[in-house]
Regions:
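NAD(P)-dependent Rossmann-like dehydrogenase/reductase catalytic/cofactor-binding core
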Residues: 287-335
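Structured loop/turn residues at secondary-structure junctions
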Residues: 99-100, 153, 209, 250, ...
């Protein structure tokens, strides 16, 4: 039986999680309902027409409070308090918490109160039972993990690379910079924001700001806890980002050894999560790419045997959205 999911928050990530499930053609997950404060006609329109990912490759229609997608009816709700959602009556296995609001344990737990069996948060969380980067530590999932975080798009890009290279040559300490496309948390014109850098016009500036993505790797790879840090530079592109990761190794290594370890993982245990390439590509080449991380083999550098620099690309919307359904299915399997 497919895992029955409901999506709370039909914004940027909520819509793309929905779309990724349908575009993948996978039969092990089924969207039963969406909950969003916008009306169903607006949500259907934004699903059908996307400035970054193009038109939805299917049929979308609305009748009353039901959005029908490729012949499958999805109930559209508009409830402010997640505790009041009809998840018990709908027999929801997992609530996909995509609003960006309910990231603390007590808040996300309202979905459990409403009758969902588990909750998967599409963001870094506070007080969660486990943070998962699919492909790296989803094997740690246990039945008692009721509230799970899917980490961030950047952590999903960095963690597979760090995992492979720590196993191969050891990482003593490292620093990541993500050159990140602008997101909805920024402003289109100069106006108020609690982060004064993000208060500036997103499409006109390169904006240095913070990220917890590197430190969060320690949540999924305990051996690297406290060994990584990072920063973010938001740039005037609408989608696709890249990490620039520099680290000291536990022993001397070579460019060839680094690349061989990544290629082996990409063809083996991390196939579909981690990919590689060796030609001069640019950010738009990775738009709508479902991998969490696409490693640039020709960009690997090694200085004095133990200082390594690598880069890896990610579609910060689409890759992460595909991992949401992967993690949801993995959570259901251990129920």
């Amino acid at each position: 039986m497919p895992v029955r999911v409901a999506i709370n928050g039909f914004g940027r990530i909520g819509r793309l999680v929905f779309r990724a499930i349908y575009e993948s053609g996978r039969k092990d997950i089924e969207v039963i309902a969406i909950n969003d404060l916008a009306d169903v006609n607006t949500n259907a329109h934004l699903l059908k027409y996307d400035s970054v990912h193009g038109r939805f490759p299917g049929e979308v229609s609305v009748a009353g409070d039901v959005m029908t997608v490729n012949g499958h009816g999805v109930k559209a709700l508009s409830v402010k308090d997640p505790a009041q959602l009809p998840w018990k009556d709908m027999n929801i296995d997992i609530a996909l918490e995509c609003s960006g609001i309910f990231t603390k344990r007590d808040d996300a737990g309202k979905h459990l109160t409403a009758g969902a069996k588990k909750v998967l948060i599409s963001a870094p969380a506070e007080g969660e039972d486990l943070t998962v980067v699919y492909g790296v530590n989803h094997g740690d999932l246990k039945p008692e993990h009721k509230i799970v975080s899917n980490a961030s798009c950047t952590t999903n890009c960095l963690a597979p690379v760090a995992y492979v290279l720590h196993e191969a040559v050891g990482i003593e300490k490292g620093f990541m910079t993500t050159i990140h496309s602008y997101t909805g948390d920024q402003r289109t014109v100069d106006t108020m924001h609690k982060d004064l850098a993000r208060a500036r016009a997103a499409a006109l500036n390169m904006i240095p700001t913070s990220t917890g993505a590197a430190k969060a790797v320690g949540k999924v790879l305990p051996a690297l806890k406290g060994k990584l840090d990072g920063t973010s530079i938001r740039v005037p592109t609408p989608n696709v980002s890249v990490i620039d990761f520099k680290f000291l190794t536990s022993r001397n290594t070579t460019i060839e050894e680094i690349n061989a370890a990544i290629e082996k993982a990409a063809k083996g245990p991390l196939k579909g999560i981690l990919a590689t390439y060796n030609v001069p590509l640019v950010s738009s080449d990775f738009n709508h790419d479902p991998h969490s991380s696409t490693f640039a083999l020709h960009e690997t550098k090694v200085i004095d045997g133990n200082f390594v620099r690598v880069i890896s690309w990610y579609d910060n919307e689409w890759g992460f959205s595909n991992r949401m359904s992967d993690t949801a299915v993995a959570m259901h399997k251990v129920s």
